[in-house]
Regions:
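Extracytoplasmic/periplasmic, Sec-exported soluble proteins
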Residues: 2-7, 29-37, 137, 141-144
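Substrate-binding/active-site groove segments that recognize
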Residues: 5-20, 41
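Generic recognition of stable, solvent-exposed alpha-helical segments in well-folded globular domains
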Residues: 10, 36, 40, 128, ...
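Structured segments of extracytoplasmic/periplasmic soluble domains
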Residues: 17-21, 43-51, 136-139, 152-159
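Acidic, glycine-anchored loop motifs typical of Ca2+
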Residues: 21-30
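Cation-handling catalytic/transport regions enriched in His/Asp/Glu
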Residues: 32-36, 44, 58-59
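Acidic/polar loop patches that form or flank catalytic/metal-binding clefts of enzymes
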Residues: 50-58
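C-terminal soluble interaction/assembly domains
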Residues: 60-164
């Protein structure tokens, strides 16, 4: 037990810095009020430079072994997509009919990314992660947590879209 509280499991210092009264009822309540809790997580992301519209991550395709040094750089974006491409690493394109993946992006070559080397059910998985992935990992420092958040948002977004 680390003293985390409420829906978002904020630690006390995060509560002091980022909790907000999102529904404007005069009380900031992350324990009993999901509106304040969600608003506070959004505030945390905003304060950590979340970039609206920027995808979080895409599956990566590797060509050769040039990816190895990139995979050792951690998950803070530290190189561009152009540099990744030069090392034989590319994001799955959303416009490529040959590859079907809901985890794709088509971003400018200047976009800063990180290469994640993970183990999935079928073996090694590689992902190119953007600054928004890094923001998620400021909330919880596990790259597996960051990827789980990404993967859980897909069915939630689909359900929300179906209900509109």
């Amino acid at each position: 037990y680390a003293g985390a509280m409420g829906y978002g499991q904020f630690i006390p210092t995060s509560y002091q810095a980022y909790a907000v009264d999102f529904d404007n009822d005069g009380v900031t309540d992350l324990v009993n009020n999901p509106v304040d809790a969600i608003g506070s997580v959004a505030n945390y992301f905003s304060e950590h430079n979340w970039k609206p519209g920027l995808p979080v991550a895409a599956r990566a395709h590797l060509d050769g072994a040039g990816y190895v040094p990139l995979a050792k750089k951690g998950y803070k974006p530290s190189f561009t997509l152009a540099q990744a491409n030069n090392a034989g690493v590319s994001a799955l394109s959303c416009n490529d009919d040959r590859l079907v993946s809901e985890y794709c992006f088509d971003l400018p070559a200047s976009t800063r990314v990180a290469l994640l080397d993970l183990t999935g059910t079928d073996g090694a998985e590689f992902w190119l992660a953007t600054d928004n992935f890094y923001v998620i990992t400021r909330y919880n420092h596990s790259r597996l947590y960051g990827l789980a958040v990404l993967q859980l948002t897909r069915p939630l977004a689909a359900a929300l879209e179906d209900n509109q």
